[in-house]
């Protein structure tokens, strides 16, 4: 064989190798590369979707936190208003109770003063009768002179 025939045979073998490679080797390689490219594209798309979902979730969390903060502030204000109302109500009840106690004490003092005056009248009447007995040197009968003694008590 000459160089030209060898070259021609090598070209044919190379052509057969290229055809064999293109028919049997190249399709699985391109398929694997395409699948890999598709996986990468799907992964990038999923990452973009996850990024937008994360941003949306972050926004929802911020809104819910703001709403919760507002609700907490409202509840605290309501609780404070209720506490003030309870305090004012307790003050009013205590004031009413104090006024009742003072009124009862005044009524009791007035009653005691009336009783003391009555006892004093009784004592003054008894002293007046005793004085009259000694002046008259005779005994005054309380049953007989009850009307006179009652008039004397009322005058005192």
UniProtKB/Swiss-Prot annotation:
| Any Pfam family the entry gives | ATP-synt_B
* Keyword presence, DNA damage: no
Record carries keyword Transcription: no
State the GO CC annotations.
Answer: plasma membrane; proton-transporting ATP synthase complex
Q: State the compartments where it is located.
A: Cell inner membrane
What domain of life is recorded for the organism? Answer: Bacteria
Any one GO molecular-function label of the UniProt entry = proton-transporting ATPase activity, rotational mechanism
The alphabetized UniProt keywords are: ATP synthesis, Cell inner membrane, Cell membrane, CF(0), Hydrogen ion transport, Ion transport, Membrane, Transmembrane, Transmembrane helix, Transport
Q: How does it assemble?
A: F-type ATPases have 2 components, F(1) - the catalytic core - and F(0) - the membrane proton channel. F(1) has five subunits: alpha(3), beta(3), gamma(1), delta(1), epsilon(1). F(0) has three main subunits: a(1), b(2) and c(10-14). The alpha and beta chains form an alternating ring which encloses part of the gamma chain. F(1) is attached to F(0) by a central stalk formed by the gamma and epsilon chains, while a peripheral stalk is formed by the delta and b chains.
Q: Which family does it belong to?
A: Belongs to the ATPase B chain family.
Give the protein's recorded name.
ATP synthase subunit b
Gene behind this chain?
atpF
